[in-house]
Amino acid sequence: MLQLIEQEEVEDVFDLNEKFLSLALGVEVDDLSLLPKIELRVDSQLHNLQVTGEILRSLEVLKLNDSVIRCFRDIGTSFKNVRVLHMARCEIRELQGIQAFEQLEELYISFNEIDDLFDISFCEHLTVLDLEGNSV
């Protein structure tokens, strides 16, 4: 069970995200930037994923299955080193912003609401694409 974070402990959004991730993942704040792989369930309307990417700078594998993320723009542009991305059942409607994942090699986006693949053409390194259960 997660501990509550006291308001006095939080200085800004970056600090709040660090504390939340540290508690949720069970690691020290100083070790967050070293994590190569994580699995989270988030609602991009409530959680600032741009800041999360700035904190998790070494991240190469990101699993966000069963999250609420309707488009890649909601994730931001800070996950530059992610090579493998899992986003099954996330209510994704469009792929605009996918090019922010500059190193993306594997994309698992099954059972979403995707009906257009145009933006996938910007993913130069992509070798694996799972679209099962989409409208394409």
Task: Label every model-predicted segment.
Residues D12, E102-L107, G133-V136:
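Phosphate-binding glycine-rich loops and adjacent basic patches that engage nucleotide phosphates
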Residues T52-E54, I75-S78, G97-A100, S110, ...:
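Low-complexity, polar/charged sequence tracts that form flexible coils or short amphipathic helices
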Residues R93, F111, D115-D119, E124-V136:
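Leucine-rich repeat domain C-terminal region
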